[in-house]
């Protein structure tokens, strides 16, 4: 069994493209769909900040924004998870760079790859 977290950059909030409440609604619906299929996300972590944002409250060069490691540090601290028990699966280069910066393994997944191959890779890495 694994704990599953989402650590996501959400610059669209800082840029005024959508509201933080919209993102929370999306995460809520995602969680509902996962639960219908016997899965779940243990916790969502997000960075709504961007140095070039248009919304003053979110215009910030945050240490949480990947490829920086702030969100991973929070996950590790909040849940008492050691780095040797962490793996990051991401679809962007900034995700993979974040994992490197935090000294944990990573897998780049574009959503089109075979899920069985992904789970095989997870098993190999976490052994």
Description of each model-found segment:
Residues 1-3, 36:
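Active-site neighborhood of HAD-like aspartate-dependent phosphohydrolases
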Residues 20-43, 52-88, 92-127:
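Asp-based, Mg2+/Mn2+-dependent phosphohydrolase catalytic module
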């Amino acid at each position: 069994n694994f704990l599953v977290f989402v650590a996501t950059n959400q610059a669209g909030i800082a840029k005024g493209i959508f509201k933080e409440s919209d993102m929370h609604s999306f995460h809520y619906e995602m969680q509902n769909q996962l639960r219908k299929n016997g899965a779940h996300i243990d916790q969502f972590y997000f960075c709504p900040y961007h140095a070039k944002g248009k919304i003053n409250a979110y215009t910030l060069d945050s240490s949480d924004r990947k490829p920086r490691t702030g969100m991973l540090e929070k996950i590790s601290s909040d849940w008492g998870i050691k780095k040797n028990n962490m793996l990051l699966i991401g679809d962007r280069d900034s995700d993979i760079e974040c994992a490197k910066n935090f000294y944990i393994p990573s897998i780049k997944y574009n959503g089109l790859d075979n899920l069985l191959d992904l789970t095989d890779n997870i098993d190999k890495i976490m052994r």
